[in-house]
Amino acid sequence: MTAEPTRLWPEEIRLSKGKESLFVKFDNGYETTLSAELLRVESPSAEVQGHGVGQKTTPAGKAKVTISALEPVGNYAIRISFSDGHDTGLFSWNILYDYGQRQQQLLVDYLERLAAAGGSRH
């Protein structure tokens, strides 16, 4: 995990026109665009991450998933609902920042897990 500022606050959160990505600009000037697919397969929900070590799942067939809704959760996160019905992940500002910093490696890791499981993005 990369070093994070003590306090993160999004100045702007914008859903792309086709709902296939989420743009976030933080108050420290950092900007990132995260694909709906990456957010879905790395959802911080227990459904995806599991309840303990070694329980993480590898959702297949998410290449065309889109974001159907964004809902603020207090002043620290958003709940993202996806076109496949998944809506249990709370994405804190720290998680969104971290995913932005590590998105290339997260995608590589996901594709490796998917291949090992015999799954497909489509």
How should each PLM-predicted stretch be described?
Residues 1-122:
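Motif-centric detector for short Cys/His coordination patterns
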